[in-house]
């Protein structure tokens, strides 16, 4: 499926026996859903299966849906309700439960689901059948639903809101999401990204099967395994998912096998949306001051440096690669959680979680890649970030990556130095306090204001000199100001960028603050797009 079509489908759903005594608890959970024959299962077996699959030719298993499902609207799709009496762990009466998504619209891949007894390691498949769903408020012709259509994905519920509000969702290709304490979904992760920014068209691998270990009754943690398949790669995944009170933490063990040479392999990919914000107003002609799921890419480099890269909604597609070795972490972050910053009572961007990746194995050399796609609104995700290994991936290669995913308001770690609080950009070339009614500046310039907070800035001795260190890949930066911001217990750095030629190529700006030889802050990176020369003027 084309990226835009896949994202449209996903965004439309944002609102959406013979066992030993030790296996009796799991058997009760099986009673309402799992109906297949018991078979042995473990992760080693799954890894071997994925590797063997990579040695064979890819077979596209997407199905032709009956017309009643293929032609349905997102509203009709969302109206199909899974019957909670048949949820995977219904009879467990515990802290967690799983329900399944119906196939339909663009979700044509039949995903196979299995229930696993963690003690006996016996797995039984849950087969699709119409009695698992409620079609009362839909126009679905159930007479057309013949055979085992499979499922489109699954969603996880947590007590005390079992069957009310899901906290984890796997749906479409290898996409998945989770919430934090607000219960609001936001950005998405993926199992794998292939050729997102490459010569050939992007490939979207599918999770084709899942195996769910039945958790203990009082546990808020469970394990699910997944088989991934695509024309270029296969994968065996183990997700240890911990649904904590304030966040969801996923411990991921990914074993990837290349069927073919892969130009760009994206590890721990995440997808978000940035339409406009405090520094980018081009698409913000609405009543909302800001519209975004994430406002920045945060990176904790292998050498210990912290980077803040504000996101853009560029006029043209932009790709940036940040080289690193054994990164300590990276993520797409939503730092501002104030309602006043968004004024949104429908999508609630003030409640969107951040997503942080923490490698748990040595990733070696590579780059954190950022793709920013032009978008005219908030209905399409336009931000993609992932890790790409430096070593080319050849057919037959097998790779293993371990990492944790933290779905929380803010990342679980942060720089001990001052951090970037906000970035603003606007008209430059004048002294602060100037009013447009007086006169316009004689020389065109672009002003940037970067606010820093934390890191002990509020405890610096009176009279401490704060030095902004700014570099630009093109043009000239000058007219620096250092302003105390008591409201955030920090400082605001302002400076103007002046063009020195007619180039409209992106300008890379870099800033941090120091006193004497001591670095005080993380590093701010920004990509600015100069207007055409004939636009560099005031009225």
From Swiss-Prot:
GO cellular component, one term: outer membrane-bounded periplasmic space
GO BP annotations listed: beta-glucan biosynthetic process
UniProt keyword terms in alphabetical order: Periplasm, Signal
Major subcellular location class: periplasm
Pfam families in alphabetical order: MdoG
Pathway(s) where this gene product acts: Glycan metabolism; osmoregulated periplasmic glucan (OPG) biosynthesis
MF terms (GO), sorted A to Z: carbohydrate binding; catalytic activity
Post-translational modification: Predicted to be exported by the Tat system. The position of the signal peptide cleavage has not been experimentally proven.
SUPFAM superfamilies, per the entry: E set domains (SSF81296), Galactose mutarotase-like (SSF74650)
Gene3D superfamilies in the record: 2.70.98.10, Immunoglobulins
Cell compartments where the protein resides: Periplasm
Signal sequence extent: 1-31
Family that this chain belongs to: Belongs to the OpgD/OpgG family.
Role description: Probably involved in the control of the structural glucose backbone of osmoregulated periplasmic glucans (OPGs).
Protein name: Glucans biosynthesis protein D
Organism: Pseudomonas fluorescens (strain ATCC BAA-477 / NRRL B-23932 / Pf-5)
